[in-house]
Amino acid sequence: MLELKFVRNNPDIVGRALISRNMGTELIDSLLEYDAAWRECLIEGDDLKHKRNVVTREIAQLKKENKDAASRINEMQGINSRIKELDDKIRDYKSKINEIMLSIPNIPSETTPVGKDENDNPVVRVVGEPREFTFTPKPHWEIGESLDILDFERAAKISGQGFAVYKGMGAKLERALINFMLDVHTRQGYLEVFPPVLINEKAMTGTGQLPKFKDDMYGCTDGFYLAPTAEVPVTNLFMDEYMENLPVFLTAYTACFRREAGKHGQDTRGIIRNHQFNKVELVKFVMPETSYEELEKLTLDAEEILKLLKLPYRVVSLCTGDLGFSAAKTYDLEVWVPTQEKYREISSCSNFDNFQARRANIRYRTPEGPQFVHTLNGSGLAVGRTVVAILENYQREDGSVEIPEVLRPYMGGAEEIRKVCH
């Protein structure tokens, strides 16, 4: 969340930021209107409360002198009535202001490229060369079904479309990747945590999922939401706290839940975009002056997984029109998917400046007074999409799949996945 005072004093800066995000400036116009009315009511209310104190003393003095205080009492009643009216308006305006403030996205960093959509995202670097196949590669869902390691039919039977059952070596591959990713990241200096995935509304608001993305979330009847990403519970671990000993680096595995499956035509099959998926997350809490340096390091930490798996990928810098709601700057890691002949997102690494920390009230102490920390996070990585990349990039002509060398110790020494005849 932005600071109200900043928006009030810099409407042009905020307005330009919204325009760069393909938004209008109506939110700012409404905010300034409510803010002016709110402050006007505050001033009038303070003046009337001061006047009420004066009249109260006058009434007391008149009664003490046995004089008629009726006119002053009538005046007091009018003052009290107006104060109540103003208090109601103040609450109403404040509610409207808070609602708008929660709906205003972060201001993009000066280093975030300006653009309209993903077509304007510049490529930062390309790592590895896409494999040249001597046969026609199969899509991951065909590989998974032919090897009997992915079952979409039975998943649909119990949960509907947009789910998958991992079986045998498929389940082992998923589990191996989670453990491998966590091991790599803990060696990089991240502390592993295992948080709840049922999240309350306050925490969801703290990281920016609510109110804007409510329709994309799975809500429960008792006020909880299923975590759409481990970013939410991990960042909110320090909600309403003063943090000591910055920086703090955390990594976590969780299942994630989103309603987005089926929104993208080419992803209606397979496991690229499901309602439920696993992800390993990286989260950093840092001092403001180091946050952009830490973003570069976090991105490299996420990239390390792809390098160790020897998967070809590229890094792109998201432009203003493609930037997430809470982010000031984002790098996307995109892995090569052979059957689509293009790179697909497998991680987003973002610096949120103090946007999330202000919403979640995460601060640290300085000699000048309390300050909001800067938060960063990134996927390290989306596990299902990593399975997609392995199945497609490591497939063989005979239908088997080679297991990346770094994963073999996590899979009992197995070097390949072949269909098991029961």
Curated annotation (Swiss-Prot):
Pathway annotation: Aminoacyl-tRNA biosynthesis; selenocysteinyl-tRNA(Sec) biosynthesis; L-seryl-tRNA(Sec) from L-serine and tRNA(Sec): step 1/1
Enzyme class, UniProt record, top EC level: ligase
Catalysed reaction equations from the record: tRNA(Ser) + L-serine + ATP = L-seryl-tRNA(Ser) + AMP + diphosphate + H(+); tRNA(Sec) + L-serine + ATP = L-seryl-tRNA(Sec) + AMP + diphosphate + H(+)
UniProtKB keywords: Aminoacyl-tRNA synthetase, ATP-binding, Cytoplasm, Ligase, Nucleotide-binding, Protein biosynthesis
GO molecular function, one term: serine-tRNA ligase activity
GO terms of biological process kind: selenocysteine biosynthetic process; seryl-tRNA aminoacylation
Classification via SUPFAM superfamilies: Class II aaRS and biotin synthetases (SSF55681), tRNA-binding arm (SSF46589)
Record-listed E.C. numbers: 6.1.1.11
An example Gene Ontology CC term for this record: cytoplasm
Oligomeric form and interacting partners: Homodimer. The tRNA molecule binds across the dimer.
Notes concerning its domains: Consists of two distinct domains, a catalytic core and a N-terminal extension that is involved in tRNA binding.
PANTHER family: SERINE--TRNA LIGASE, SERYL-TRNA SYNTHETASE
Name this polypeptide is given: Serine--tRNA ligase
Organism listed in the record: Methanosarcina mazei (strain ATCC BAA-159 / DSM 3647 / Goe1 / Go1 / JCM 11833 / OCM 88) (Methanosarcina frisia)
